[in-house]
A protein has these predicted regions:
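Conserved NTP-binding catalytic cores of kinases and kinase-like/nucleotidyltransferase enzymes
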Residues: 1-105, 236, 344-346
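ATP/Mg2+ or Mg2+-diphosphate-binding catalytic cores
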Residues: 14-17, 305-346
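Active-site acidic catalytic loop and adjacent metal/ATP-binding pocket
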Residues: 52-62, 66-67, 100, 207-253
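ATP-binding pocket architecture of kinase catalytic cores
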Residues: 60-161
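Activation segment
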Residues: 72, 130, 239, 247-249, ...
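A glycine-centered beta->alpha junction motif in the catalytic cores
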Residues: 106, 120-135, 180-190, 303-320
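A cross-family kinase active-site recognition segment
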Residues: 135-197, 218-220, 324
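Active-site activation/catalytic loop segments of kinase-like enzymes and analogous catalytic loops
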Residues: 252-285, 301-317
């Protein structure tokens, strides 16, 4: 049982932003973790993807599971347990999210020692069936995304966090400063030093806006923080949300900005945002004051992701973005400074 009062965690930027373990080592860790689950004794294990964490498919005669192996030095065990507590509460509120599996000792988090003295945490989840929506489908998919996000926000505002609840902080400093969780955007490939001034001017404008907007409980609280279409599944008409690894304390409107992560420069991005807002408004109201903050939220997220791309350059996701992604960031910053209603798209 966690014994501390609810709290938030500051970043530690002294560690690498990506996991240096090989795929073979990840698979070895997976098999070690699964020893603690009797149902997985004869499991077939397959690596699905690697980003902040490694996600593996675990197939058994009794059913399928997803095993998440955390990279080192990102979340402490207390933070992961807090994520699982929110998932428990969301399930109790009839929102379909991943459910962690207890091992033979009743534990939900495995601690896996490494030869160098380090360790990795692992969590086994029941597999969630569903079709993953993409930005190539009907833009109305973003209405579903907006609607389920509104339900999460409603729950977050009402939920009484248990003692010891602790999650990562997503504010302006931890997102886009040189000491942010994901590093310094200035380190991204393809961004000439001469163009830093445009981004810096943008961030100063955004910083002042965020300071004025404030962090009242109606505007700032526990959010998913990475709720895009790739983390939304639809099964038999039910909308299901996955991948809460980045959940933490942030502005609720940050979840809108996260909805178009990495594709803010896409020609359809404005249409996606409009559809997201329509879906959200079907469940909850967004005030005019909040609507006025959307441009700042969008460009802040894009710069945050620019830092992520810089610090995760070895990942498949970062490599897939191409050589012009950083230059698009500068172009969107210029649109923001010019007062564009939505600093996204072409």
């Amino acid at each position: 049982m966690l014994a501390l009062h609810a709290e938030t965690r500051e970043p530690d930027m002294s560690h690498k932003q990506y996991d240096t373990l090989s795929n073979d080592t990840i698979l070895q860790l997976a098999h070690r973790a699964l020893v603690n689950y009797p149902a997985c004794a004869q499991a077939e294990v397959r690596l699905l993807c690697r980003s902040e964490n490694a996600t593996l498919s675990v197939s058994t005669p009794q059913g399928r599971y997803a095993l998440r192996i955390h990279r080192g030095d990102y979340h402490a065990k207390q933070d992961i347990e807090s994520e699982l507590l929110w998932l428990d509460a969301l399930q109790a509120a009839d929102i379909s999210v991943p459910a962690a599996v207890e091992d033979r000792q009743g534990e939900r988090i495995q601690v896996l020692p490494l030869p160098d003295g380090g360790e990795r945490y692992a969590v086994l989840f029941h597999w969630i069936e569903g079709d993953m929506l993409t930005d190539s489908v009907d833009p109305a998919a973003f209405r579903q995304l907006g609607a389920i996000t509104a339900r999460l926000h409603h729950h977050s505002r009402k939920w009484q966090k248990p003692q010891g609840f602790r999650r990562i902080i997503w504010d302006h400093h931890t997102m886009v400063s040189p000491a942010g969780h994901w590093g310094d955007w200035r380190d991204v490939a393809g961004l000439p030093t001469a163009e830093h001034a445009v981004v810096e001017e943008t961030l100063e404008h955004v910083r002042r806006q965020m300071l004025d907007f404030g962090q009242s409980p109606e505007r700032y609280g526990l959010i998913h923080a990475d709720l895009r279409l790739t983390n939304l599944l639809v099964h038999k008409g039910e909308t299901r949300v996955i991948d809460f690894d980045d959940c933490g304390m942030g502005w609720y409107l940050h979840d809108l900005a996260a909805a178009i992560s990495f594709v803010e420069h896409h020609p359809s991005a404005p249409q996606w945002v409009e559809n997201w807002l329509r879906g959200y408004e079907q469940v909850a109201h967004i005030s005019d004051r909040e609507l006025a903050m959307i441009p700042a939220m969008l460009i802040q997220r894009r710069i945050q992701l620019t830092a992520w791309v810089a610090s995760h350059r070895e990942t498949e996701m970062a490599r897939s973005l191409g050589d012009r992604w950083a230059s698009h960031t500068v172009r969107l910053c210029q649109r923001y400074l010019e007062g564009a209603a939505l600093p996204i798209g072409i």
